[in-house]
Amino acid sequence: MGNCFRRLSLFGQPTQAKYEMLCSSDDLETEELTFFLDMTYKDFGVYQNDIISHQKDTETMKTLLGLLPMYKKTKLRHTVMERCLSNCPNHVKDALCVELMKAEKILQTMDVVFMKTLIGEFSMCTENLNQLLNKFATDQSTLSDVEKINSLIEIDGENSKRLLVELDPILHEETGLYQALPNVVTEAPSEKVKSIRVESEGESV
């Protein structure tokens, strides 16, 4: 099948018209993938020539092309959340931190998958990757529930402290009332009481 061209210039002589060769969507995706991998992993020693050498391996490129949209979507979410974290209201900050942690974990895992696919005999189908992402979602959901429980415990503790502080004046007032009551005699009888008791016993005899 021949290449397709698009005419750029509609003016002038037909022989002077300019054309550009049209690329298929697959070619554009491959170019985008090559650029992305080169920018992301060249610091680790994976260069563009190494990436291009994989283009002949259909399965490898298919795996990488399947990973790229998910990576870009997660990276975009991570960037937006990171930007919003400093200015978000306090009541949503905890939830945002959990989502940010989830995105970071997914990106780290996909970095490993990209690297292993580039330098090793490793491939992952989209279904398996979705299962992996679902696993992270479950783990982070559990973490979120644990954080909620911890928050409830902290709130309960703060409420208990507040109640104790509010009750403190009342307890002091009741203590003052108790101190105003007559003391209960707990000491040994005095000599006068003893003599009265002896006289009473003598009369009875």
From Swiss-Prot:
Domain of life: Viruses
GO cellular component, one term: host cell Golgi apparatus
Cellular location(s): Virion tegument; Host cytoplasm; Host Golgi apparatus
Assigned keywords, A-Z: Host cytoplasm, Host Golgi apparatus, Lipoprotein, Palmitate, Phosphoprotein, Virion, Virion tegument
InterPro entries: Herpes_U44
PTM description: Phosphorylated. Palmitoylation is necessary for Golgi localization.
Pfam families per the UniProt record, alphabetical: Herpes_U44
Lipidation (S-palmitoyl cysteine): 4
Assembly: Oligomerizes. Interacts with U75; this interaction mediates U75 incorporation to virions.
Family assignment from sequence similarity: Belongs to the herpesviridae UL51 family.
Main function: Plays several roles during the time course of infection, including egress of virus particles from the perinuclear space and secondary envelopment of cytoplasmic capsids that bud into specific trans-Golgi network (TGN)-derived membranes.
Protein name: Tegument protein UL51 homolog
